[in-house]
């Protein structure tokens, strides 16, 4: 059995690459000017045409195992958005990518991941408070 190992910056970079690949594929469907995507359904042997981000995300499987981990984690989170709200998969994926790209810059600069998480939690609370005011 062949096993792959990676750590540190290389691992973070690979995971973020996977998230970027997922987000690039899903982002094309975003909004009213989003485009249709043609996917090939392996089981049925027919093409599928869709503008639904969650459907596009379901088809994303990456060859690199570390990239695939990143894509699968974000895909699961985005599917929860679709399950709970009925929509928002594409937006959740694109926002997650933006947040994690910014976090990667701070990690590279030496900021503690725990401090980054605390900052994200504070920002989340502030956003929820503002939304409750509306």
Give residue ranges: language-model regions.
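N-terminal glycine-/lysine-enriched basic segments
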Residues: 1-134
């Amino acid at each position: 059995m062949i096993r792959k190992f990676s750590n540190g910056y290389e691992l973070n970079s690979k995971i973020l690459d996977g998230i970027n690949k997922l987000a690039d594929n899903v982002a094309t469907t975003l909004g009213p000017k989003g485009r249709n995507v043609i996917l090939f359904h392996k089981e049925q042997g027919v093409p599928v045409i869709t503008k639904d981000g969650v459907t596009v995300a379901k088809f994303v499987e990456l060859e690199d195992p570390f990239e695939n981990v990143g894509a699968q984690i974000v895909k699961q989170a985005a599917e929860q958005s679709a399950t709970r709200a009925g929509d928002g998969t594409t937006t959740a994926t694109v926002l997650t990518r933006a947040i994690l790209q910014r976090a990667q810059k701070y990690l590279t600069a030496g900021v503690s991941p725990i401090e980054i998480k605390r900052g994200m939690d504070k920002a989340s609370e502030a956003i929820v408070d503002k939304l409750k005011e509306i």
